[in-house]
């Protein structure tokens, strides 16, 4: 099942020798990115647990890795992008106790668990489409891959890294000394921080569930060699990433809050079973509200649907790409106002270029063309440097400043305007995803709009010359009501949106 979202941008025809460096959590430093197969990238992202509507924290993760994927496409790589859907096994306290989050929501809403999963999955798809997030290559669900998870658990038991206890199966942490290498936690430190209340069926409090016995009345249950039950939260990602990307795939991504225990467990499950796992680990930082992490458990979140009622989704996306994926994004009215202003500046520049293009003269503008090329180089260098979107956005603003200055100074040639337009579309649209398909006018539509606006401005100018100011003001106010601003300049009236 795949998300219904925007069409993937065409990968560049250049040879993918991009010079990208990225921050690898495992190595705790920036390292050159070298895919295992030249020109191809396998990428896995931990997706949503579909038991309620998504909030801005979820959007940050999805947009961050969408931009990383788009950047790889821009530099010529073919990308297989897999992101899972957790629709079973994620318990209330993110460990091995409590109710399944989806089963609990099903009881609250008086629905079947799969009705809840479908309802919130499609809600998530709708939100991602609004944010112009590209659909995954593959979007596997945990409940659709129970046999693969059981098979991986059996491998771990056979190799002595898992044990059966009263119908449940646990990973034996002591059998795998490398456990903790991603997060940098030592086993003795983990033992000190473990809760005193430990399930009696565990040999060690640090062990985690691979398969859970289904208690009487539990709604989600499958047959297994150990009796009826359901998979633990961590096993699905190991099983599904290996199935669709193979051993030693290139990039595994997710939120910083998943580094431990989820990603740590994923590595242990795969490698203890003899399967080399992800080669690079990338983690996005959180969204905060008043300095605290935005989360459902804290109750300090606002759903994306509620935000969409107040803000253009593209303004929200602009807010998210304006900070680095490894930096904290603060949720505030001031941040949204700044994002709205910045995004409007870019879109107005693009619209003005599209407005001027049909009548642009065939003249050379070598100085402006060189400036445009310089901004493109700056943008691409920023994205090569661990996907530095703040610097990339700054390059777009630099492009905007130079193009606006040239337009204000007089006529700009068709070649320079075309180069500027293509830079906005390729970099701002294709890489950062800020100009969703269908949200900026096609060239033929733009020409029609421009011609109609010229007629309206001529009519308004006629009223002004005849000193019929009430009629002229009425036209201006009518245009303002639909988001069009008219400015009276020395060169005559101009309009913008």
UniProtKB/Swiss-Prot annotation:
Recorded catalytic activity of this chain's protein: tRNA(Cys) + L-cysteine + ATP = L-cysteinyl-tRNA(Cys) + AMP + diphosphate
Cofactor note: Binds 1 zinc ion per subunit.
Protein biosynthesis among keywords: yes
Residue sites binding ATP per the record: 296
Locations listed in the record: Cytoplasm
GO BP: any one term: cysteinyl-tRNA aminoacylation
Keywords on record: Aminoacyl-tRNA synthetase, ATP-binding, Cytoplasm, Ligase, Metal-binding, Nucleotide-binding, Protein biosynthesis, Zinc
Residue span of motif 'KMSKS' region: 293-297
CDD domains in UniProt: CysRS_core (cd00672)
Renumbered ranges of motif 'HIGH' region: 48-58
Family statement: Belongs to the class-I aminoacyl-tRNA synthetase family.
Description of how the protein assembles with itself and partners: Monomer.
Protein name: Cysteine--tRNA ligase
Organism of derivation: Deinococcus geothermalis (strain DSM 11300 / CIP 105573 / AG-3a)
Gene: cysS
């Amino acid at each position: 099942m795949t998300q219904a979202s925007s069409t993937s941008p065409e990968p560049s025809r250049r040879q993918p020798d991009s010079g990208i460096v990225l921050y690898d959590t495992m190595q705790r430093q920036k390292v050159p990115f070298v895919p295992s197969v030249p020109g191809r990238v396998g990428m896995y992202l931990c997706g949503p647990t579909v038991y309620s509507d998504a909030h801005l924290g979820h959007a940050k993760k999805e947009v961050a890795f969408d931009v990383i994927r788009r950047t790889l496409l821009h530099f010529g790589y073919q990308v297989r992008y897999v992101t899972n859907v957790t629709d079973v096994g994620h318990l209330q306290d993110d460990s091995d106790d409590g109710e399944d989050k989806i089963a609990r929501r099903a009881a609250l809403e008086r629905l079947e668990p799969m009705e809840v999963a479908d309802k919130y999955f499609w809600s998530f798809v709708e939100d991602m489409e609004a944010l112009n997030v590209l659909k995954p290559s593959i979007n596997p669900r945990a409940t659709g891959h129970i046999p693969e998870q059981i098979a991986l658990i059996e491998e771990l038991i056979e190799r002595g890294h898992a044990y059966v206890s009263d119908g449940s199966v646990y990973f034996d942490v002591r059998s795998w000394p490398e456990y903790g290498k991603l997060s940098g936690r030592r086993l003795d430190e983990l033992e000190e921080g473990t809760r005193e209340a430990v399930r009696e069926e565990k040999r060690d409090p640090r062990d985690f569930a691979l398969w859970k016995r289904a208690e009487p009345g539990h709604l989600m249950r499958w047959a297994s060699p150990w009796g009826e039950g359901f998979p633990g939260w961590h096993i699905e990602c190991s099983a599904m990433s290996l199935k669709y990307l193979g051993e030693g795939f290139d990039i595994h991504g997710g939120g910083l809050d998943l580094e431990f225990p989820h990603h740590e467990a994923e590595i242990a499950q795969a490698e203890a079973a003899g399967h080399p796992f992800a080669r690079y680990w990338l983690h996005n930082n959180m969204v905060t509200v008043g300095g605290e992490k935005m989360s459902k458990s804290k109750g300090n979140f606002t759903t994306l649907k509620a935000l969409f009622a107040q803000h253009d989704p593209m303004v929200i996306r602009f807010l998210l790409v304006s900070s680095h994926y490894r930096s904290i994004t603060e949720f505030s009215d001031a941040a949204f106002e700044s994002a709205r202003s910045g995004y409007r500046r870019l879109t107005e520049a693009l619209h003005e270029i599209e407005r001027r293009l049909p009548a642009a003269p065939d003249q050379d503008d070598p100085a402006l063309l060189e400036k445009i090329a310089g901004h493109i180089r700056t943008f691409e260098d920023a994205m090569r440097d661990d996907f530095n979107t703040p610097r990339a956005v700054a390059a777009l603003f630099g492009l905007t400043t130079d193009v606006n200055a040239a337009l204000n100074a007089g006529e700009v040639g068709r070649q320079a305007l075309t180069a500027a337009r293509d830079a906005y579309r390729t970099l701002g649209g294709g890489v950062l995803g800020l100009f969703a398909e269908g949200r900026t006018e096609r060239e033929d539509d733009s020409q029609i709009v421009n011609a109609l606006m010229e007629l309206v401005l001529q009519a308004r100018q006629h009223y002004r010359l005849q000193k019929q100011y009430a009629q002229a003001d009425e036209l201006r106010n009518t245009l303002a009501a639909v988001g069009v601003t008219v400015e009276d300049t020395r060169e005559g009236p101009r309009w913008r949106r």
